[in-house]
């Protein structure tokens, strides 16, 4: 038994060693916890700095724009059509002449009646008259079918494709489309809307892809037959125009073949120009030449012409094809520059707006994210100051806007 005297010593030694290791581990864990807390604190600080810096930059940009030269605001603002959620804010922009139009959609009816919306529009138009400026463009998306932004309370009509497919004869089709356009024109004019982003003249190519969640042209297109689409668009536009509502042919160069969704990301149209000219572009060209229609430019990249820029701000497409080859002298408006296919490009909405106006576009739409108006306007003001805006293109655009003004829809203001 005398030989086992060392056993307790070994046991105590092992116990002390384990306690030492445990203490060291706790120290390490404490340090790790401290480090993680410090890292989390730094990340939170960085996040807050980013938020406040971004918000501060936005507020500074907004103040700079609103304090800008009124003549410059009016000169550049006539090219911008913006959405809004805060009526007081858009009213301030109209008072300064800083925009050329407004976009009305579902949220503008939330919490108020059609009559209240009607009076808001009348108030904005009265402000324009006080400044001796032309009427605002007051636009909406009322295609019928799944894109009927103001239905209800306005009449919800089926898609034009359904009207066409149910027509027994060409004469019946003509009558039905006339009634359809008459309903849209009459109801929109009653609210004070003078520009409808319809009809869709993209051809139905039957393209259905999982990645296309928002464009879904196959559900909105009139037909796969370009002659039918051209005839229906012509009849529809004429019916609306009788009520003072201008139509919009969309979305050049045609979205029916796309597999991507330009609301979310870039998409390429790889079809040869010769094939597009013989098929997809027939409705655009025919109706553009024979009506008062505006034309909306989509955001796909037409790879045969310009591999770098979406059509909406591609000089090769806008100036090269539409203005030069087609000799089109009507109004061109872009699709929303809040969309991913523009916003996520290297140019962003600001650079894209400068390039669009320099290419020969008349109106740039900023509807979903109305806050983009301020950085876009600030960029335009700087571009003008540094001679980066084409004086020739802007002069031609002002001339077109003067020759094709919004139609004045008289809505009386409420008594004071």
Regions found by a protein language model. Give the residues of each.
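Second-shell residues forming the walls of enzyme active-site clefts
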Residues: 113-125, 228-389
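Mid-to-C-terminal alpha-helical segments outside catalytic/metal-binding sites
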Residues: 379-382, 386-414
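N-terminal hydrophobic targeting/anchoring segments and the immediately downstream early-domain regions
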Residues: 1-156, 367
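Glycine-rich, aromatic-flanked loop segments that form ligand/cofactor-binding clefts
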Residues: 128-156, 181-207, 229-253
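Hydrophobic faces of well-ordered beta-strands that scaffold small-molecule active sites
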Residues: 78-84, 100-104, 136-142, 195-199, ...
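A charged helix-plus-loop insertion that forms the helical arch/lid used to bind
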Residues: 155-170, 219-223
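Glycine-rich anion/phosphate-binding loops
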Residues: 116-119, 167-183, 227-230, 277
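Short, acidic/polar
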Residues: 84-96, 176-187, 278-284, 346-355
């Amino acid at each position: 038994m005398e030989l086992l005297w060392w056993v307790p010593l070994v046991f105590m030694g092992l116990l002390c060693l384990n306690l030492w290791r445990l203490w060291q581990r706790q120290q390490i864990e404490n340090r790790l916890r401290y480090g993680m807390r410090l890292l989390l604190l730094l990340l939170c600080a960085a996040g807050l700095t980013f938020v406040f810096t971004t918000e501060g930059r936005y507020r500074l940009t907004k103040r700079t724009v609103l304090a800008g030269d009124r003549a410059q605001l009016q000169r550049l603002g006539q090219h911008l059509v913006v959405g809004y959620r805060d009526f007081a804010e858009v009213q301030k922009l109209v008072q300064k002449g800083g925009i050329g139009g407004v976009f009305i959609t579902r949220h503008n009816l939330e919490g108020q009646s059609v009559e209240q919306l009607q009076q808001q529009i009348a108030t904005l138009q009265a402000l324009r008259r006080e400044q001796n400026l032309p009427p605002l463009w007051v636009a909406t998306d009322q295609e019928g079918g799944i894109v009927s932004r103001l239905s209800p309370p306005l009449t919800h009509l089926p898609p034009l494709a359904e009207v066409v497919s149910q027509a027994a004869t060409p004469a019946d089709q003509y009558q039905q489309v006339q009634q359809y356009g008459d309903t849209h024109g009459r109801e929109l004019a009653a609210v004070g809307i003078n520009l409808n982003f319809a009809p869709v003249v993209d051809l139905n190519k039957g393209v259905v892809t999982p990645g296309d969640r928002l464009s879904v042209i196959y559900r909105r297109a009139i037909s796969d037959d370009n002659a039918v689409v051209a005839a229906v668009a012509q009849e529809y536009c004429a019916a609306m125009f009788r009520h003072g509502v201008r139509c919009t042919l969309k979305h050049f160069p045609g979205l029916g073949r796309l597999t991507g969704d330009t609301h979310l990301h870039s998409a390429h149209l790889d079809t040869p120009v010769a094939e597009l000219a013989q098929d997809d572009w027939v409705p655009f060209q025919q109706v553009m030449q024979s009506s008062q229609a505006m034309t909306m430019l989509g955001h796909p990249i037409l790879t045969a012409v310009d591999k770098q820029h979406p059509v909406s701000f591609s000089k090769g497409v806008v100036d090269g094809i539409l203005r030069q080859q087609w000799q089109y002298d009507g109004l061109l408006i872009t699709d929303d520059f809040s969309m991913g296919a523009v916003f996520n490009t290297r140019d962003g909405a600001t650079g894209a707006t400068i390039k669009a106006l320099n290419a020969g576009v008349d109106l740039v739409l900023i509807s979903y994210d109305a806050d983009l108006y301020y950085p876009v306007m600030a960029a335009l003001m700087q571009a003008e100051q540094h001679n980066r805006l084409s004086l020739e293109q802007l002069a031609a655009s002002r001339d077109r806007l003067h020759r094709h003004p919004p139609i004045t829809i008289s809505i009386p203001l409420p008594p004071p």
